[in-house]
A protein has these predicted regions:
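Small beta-barrel nucleic-acid-binding modules, primarily SNase/OB-fold domains
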Residues: 2, 6, 12-161
């Protein structure tokens, strides 16, 4: 009876997770076909993916934003043509229909790298990213204090307008 109960508990934990249920919104991985800007990519499968909690300066438009080309180049150097892993948060898509995900390449999470190196600011649009918001805000505060990226190059900082 005890073995049966342990087995049932193991199955329940496997099925339900241990309180850290991940949302499955799209593919778990894919190859990046195109880097649109500092915080958005297109996979070979056609899905557009917006990085959760990272808001990079725009590189297009009326002259683009300060540090937009640098953020785009940094992102391209990390992910273009490479296989990435996608982890989803509390929401699957933004209002433009893009998948919202934490994107990793070779065990490095691109979202956190962008914020900690000053290539992006934190953007929290509830509920997406709620569980990791404080972590990203701490990374942004460190980048701001060290005047990395946008924090040293731009006045005003594009994502602070």
């Amino acid at each position: 009876m005890r073995a049966l109960m342990k087995g049932a508990l193991a199955c329940l934990l496997a099925a339900c997770g241990e309180g850290d249920a991940e949302v499955s919104c799209g593919p778990a991985s894919g190859r990046v076909a195109e880097v649109l800007d500092g915080d958005t990519v297109v996979l070979e499968s056609g899905e557009r993916v917006r990085y959760l909690l990272a808001d990079a300066p725009e590189r297009t438009g009326a002259g683009g934003d300060c540090f937009g080309p640098e953020a785009h180049a940094f992102n391209r150097g990390l992910v273009e043509g490479r296989r990435v892993t996608l982890t989803y948060g509390e929401a699957c898509e933004d209002r433009f229909g893009r998948l919202l995900a934490y994107v990793s390449v070779e065990e490095r999470e691109v979202n956190t790298l962008l914020v900690e190196r000053g290539h992006a600011c934190v953007l929290h649009v509830p509920p997406a990213g709620r569980s990791r918001r404080a972590e990203f805000q701490a990374l942004e505060a460190q980048a701001r204090l060290a005047r990395r990226g946008v924090w040293g190059a731009c006045a005003p900082v594009p994502c602070q307008r």
